[in-house]
């Protein structure tokens, strides 16, 4: 087990693993922190990350079994201790790791008497077994048992309802979820307007991925969801009842900000308070509530940052720049 003391960063936002352990071949645990965060950000990130960890990460499972020895899935076979249903349930529990895409075939071909475990599965090169000791069946007599297996990589659940009795092929309910559980908690520190948060994220996996690998994959999946928003070239605003549609180009906030900084000395910005700018009361109150007190605070925010302020609009950003350019 690896455990580190938690040191709170006061500068750059960063992830850190503070605890890592392997409880068994099929149970890994990791605890991570992200800090420093503004009030409310930890819960937003924690909820999104937990959902991505539990629902967006792909896993590999056995999804079908076929054998000439099996008449139907609730039958008992002479020379085998377990029922067919129990064997299918045991195959469902096998933990696999792979980077395959599509479907692959595997095979079990054993002669009794003896125990059949996961190590008896003949796998394609792209797939490996996490725990070779996982039990599948017990052969009590000198019989031959051959089972063809179908392996797939997917995400979430796959509940197979239909059986194909004609070719003696039986579906297996698959749980493509390497992350068994994920929790997040929040620790707040600081006072008043300076209050910040630390996000603690706990991850348990089945061994096919480490918690760190799961965290990276969940993060990539979330990033990919938001990338399309970075390529938006225009904003579309819909009026009441969608009767009219107005399309406006993105406001060139950055260009005007650069020009403004060229005209004025940035060093002086920190000594100019926003109440000196003669802003409309609503805009002034919105900025104050967001801890923007000086001109430097204001200019350190992008157009996107300002629009995120509650009750703040695109027109307010334009009005602010118009006022600043006259100063």
UniProtKB/Swiss-Prot annotation:
Residues 1-233 are annotated as: Alpha N-terminal domain (alpha-NTD). It is found in: Plastid, Chloroplast. It catalyses: RNA(n) + a ribonucleoside 5'-triphosphate = RNA(n+1) + diphosphate. Coiled coil: none annotated. Its EC number is 2.7.7.6. Belongs to the RNA polymerase alpha chain family. It comes from the Eukaryota. GO terms for molecular function: DNA binding; DNA-directed RNA polymerase activity; protein dimerization activity. DNA-dependent RNA polymerase catalyzes the transcription of DNA into RNA using the four ribonucleoside triphosphates as substrates. GO terms for cellular component: chloroplast; DNA-directed RNA polymerase complex; mitochondrion. Keywords: Chloroplast, DNA-directed RNA polymerase, Nucleotidyltransferase, Plastid, Transcription, Transferase. SUPFAM superfamilies: C-terminal domain of RNA polymerase alpha subunit (SSF47789), Insert subdomain of RNA polymerase alpha subunit (SSF56553), RBP11-like subunits of RNA polymerase (SSF55257). One of its GO terms (biological process) is DNA-templated transcription. In plastids the minimal PEP RNA polymerase catalytic core is composed of four subunits: alpha, beta, beta', and beta''. When a (nuclear-encoded) sigma factor is associated with the core the holoenzyme is formed, which can initiate transcription. This is DNA-directed RNA polymerase subunit alpha. Gene3D superfamilies: 5' to 3' exonuclease, C-terminal subdomain, DNA-directed RNA polymerase, insert domain, RNA polymerase, RBP11-like subunit. It is an enzyme of class 2 (transferase). Signal peptide: none annotated.
